[in-house]
């Protein structure tokens, strides 16, 4: 009898919670309608499109979905969220690995920004880019409006907003710095729904936080970037290696010395690692002949068998297309691409011999192909003596990893997720985290770091803040307390407002 009473009470409570949830959603929608801000009704086609996360492993249910088309719309939507007492999250490209455009949890008012994608370049070659533009579309517009370019990543569907707020790493970073290094101003909506401009001279502390602080401080409606002239010649390349275990260790040691001391600024490099391969790839801001002169000595020094399997002279547009991997370049909305995966990341200084040996041993001992899943690792040459990224101090912007030589992305996905009926396996988390541990466990605490844009959803909020923002965390917390003391724009891992 007691169990029946307990069950009845639980069902009654669930009904009350559901009714309150529906009432809150209806209230927000009514407020948006009164402010003439577009929104999606629950269970509509638009709700299904915009309300489904890119990473289906971490899909959440928003309190409501607003679709602003101007800065004023964003401000009005923020006011509706404030009136309803819910947290508010901005979703640009929607590619956050932790679904932070949803807040990383149920119940946020989500602002779907991808209808705001305008890009314009003025006579001073300053690009004004709306907060919902994606990298591919932005690159095309910059080229079309005066042959301009911006340092950014390779995935065309990634939103400019999340990319720059987290850092903005890509194949031009070693030469031209992070995306955030080109940001000179922004128009933002604050947590009280007011609209302000930020730059080095206006709300400079908030401007500092927006450059690498991961979001959660304000909602950016427009970014302003300096740009550079798109180069006429870029050479893309791939070096294919056939290394045994011993050659892996020797090769990585040689590459580390070269990356730290010799690798020229005009070159970017990434090691693409999976169960069957370890290849080098990237871009060179120059011609193929000069690139061969750079690659051949380090290939010889690395030892083992290696071959230049691709060497293609192209231009800025051509190198963008090289790394699309079948994706559409010209993307605005609607965007309906999804994956089912777990990712992790790591930043680190020069590795000890112990760490390199442990990483190689783990790869050889544990990396057999897993049926129905595909894993890979991107090992980026991040810093070093000649890196443009490393030429800026760690505290000049909120991006806290400029002193780190290396950046890794670890990624494990389920291929046939549409027909998958089982949750992501616990063994997948353990496998990827095992790779990370081979390096992380050898590092002192103050040199451990992770890249926010390659989010690890298994971190606690305390762990995430410490690893994503390292020595800049305390300053970010103070700025958060100044501009968003009630954590209106917070998510499950964002910087907390601590004075």
Swiss-Prot record:
Name recorded for this polypeptide:
Glucooligosaccharide oxidase
Cellular component GO terms held in the UniProt record: extracellular region
Q: How is it modified after translation?
A: The FAD cofactor is bound via a bicovalent 6-S-cysteinyl, 8alpha-N1-histidyl FAD linkage.
Keywords for this protein:
Disulfide bond, FAD, Flavoprotein, Glycoprotein, Metal-binding, Nucleotide-binding, Oxidoreductase, Secreted, Signal, Zinc
* Binding of substrate, residues: 97, 154, 270, 378, 409, 454
| Organism expressing this protein natively | Sarocladium strictum
Which cysteine pairs are covalently linked by disulfides here?
Answer: 31-80
- Named cofactor requirement(s): FAD
This entry's Enzyme Commission designation comes to: 1.1.3.-
PROSITE patterns cross-referenced by the UniProt entry: FAD_PCMH (PS51387), OX2_COVAL_FAD (PS00862)
State whether keyword Oxidoreductase applies: yes
Report any Pfam family annotated for this entry: FAD_binding_4
Q: Does the keyword Kinase apply?
A: no
Function description: Catalyzes the selective oxidation of C1 hydroxyl moieties on mono- and disaccharides with concomitant reduction of molecular oxygen to hydrogen peroxide. This results in the formation of the corresponding lactones, which typically undergo spontaneous hydrolysis. Glucooligosaccharide oxidase is able to oxidize the monosaccharide D-glucose as well as the disaccharides maltose, cellobiose, and lactose.
Cofactor: binding comment? Binds 1 FAD per subunit in a bicovalent manner.
Enzyme active site: 454 (proton acceptor)
Q: Which domain of life is it from?
A: Eukaryota
Q: What pH-related activity note exists for this entry? A: Optimum pH is 10. Stable from pH 5 to pH 11.
